Amino acid sequence: MPQVGTYKRHQKEEVIALMGGLPFKADIWDWQFESNPFGYDFDPVVLEEAGQIVGFNAGMDIQVYFNGEIVPALWSCDFFVHKNYRGKGIGQVVKNEQIKKSDMIMSFGISNMAAPVLLKKGWVANKDVALFKRYKKIDSAKKCLLVILQVLNKLLGFLHSSGKSDSEIITTHELSNKQEIDRLWNKVKSSYKKIVVRNYDYLHWKYEKHPLAKYLFLEVRHNNELKAVGVVREHNGQVKLIDLLAHADDSASRLCIIKQLEINFPSSHLFICTTTDHLLQKSFLSLGYFKAWDKPRFFVRAEHDNQEGAMDWFLMTGDSDGELLSASSDSYSIIADNGVE
């Protein structure tokens, strides 16, 4: 019978093999798990039998601004059961152990197989996640219809998006300094009910220290004061708005950042963003994006406020470990294509 174990650093290669041998996982492991921006230790769930890892569930410890307080939380990620032990209840045991790790556990980008397991264990689904797209290239009948929808959305949103902004937007490869980013975060955090702490340490770790991926930053300034920061990534003609730091009511900065995407990437054929932010969603529609039918799942298990704990979150693409993996995979493929060892 498998027993709960304690993760040891020398087991890294065994865990990566359990994951199916992701070619880039070794390159990002220490950054993702051993260099936490909030100073937390890596403490995954490990199930072992006869010296072999048969179940594993990692977690990325973070802090969240939750109804006016800064509290610890855990992003669940990298949940794997050895192929010879599937269908034997090992996954249930792993999740039972993970529940002991944190009073608030969040999961984003959940598979069809994992979703019912989490719901049975007390996770609650968020209803606000939406995926927005804008096609610039028509190569099928379906895309032709979607482009028509984009035009209609833009016409309907013309009054919302046509106002002039007196702000300046700057594209840069580096975040602004720690003092400016932290000042902006402290200014805007209370405008949200629930949001992952987006201070300088977190943003710097996630988007500047990533071992493989490269991100661009869009700074919105008014009279040289930093008002908002957008995080962007492009790969093979697809542009993603990954993250946003701005006041919850700042419509002008949202519109400014979305417009800048097409200015910076005029030849790209697809623009994408996943978000729960209703003002950002409205801004996308007004600028000719459409709301896709498919969307990732976001579940929360909050020990003291479970039914309400999944509601009213500000969430972006970058909150998901799926983006972390996607960025790694895209960057790894570029390295491989260029013949770089």
Where are these regions (language model features)?
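Short amphipathic alpha-helix that is part of the acyltransferase structural core
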Residues: M1-I53, I70-W75, V129, Q150-D201, ...
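Catalytic micro-motifs at enzyme active sites that drive phosphoryl/nucleotidyl and oxygen chemistry
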Residues: E34, D61-N67, Q92-K95
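Glycine-rich phosphate-binding "P-loop"
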Residues: A73, C77-K83, L244-A248
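Conserved acetyl-CoA-binding loop-helix of GNAT-fold acetyltransferases
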Residues: V81, R86-K100, D250-I263
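Active-site/acyl-donor-binding loops of N-acyltransferases
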Residues: I105-H160, H222, R233-S251, I258-E341
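Non-catalytic interaction/regulatory modules that flank or connect domains
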Residues: K178-V232
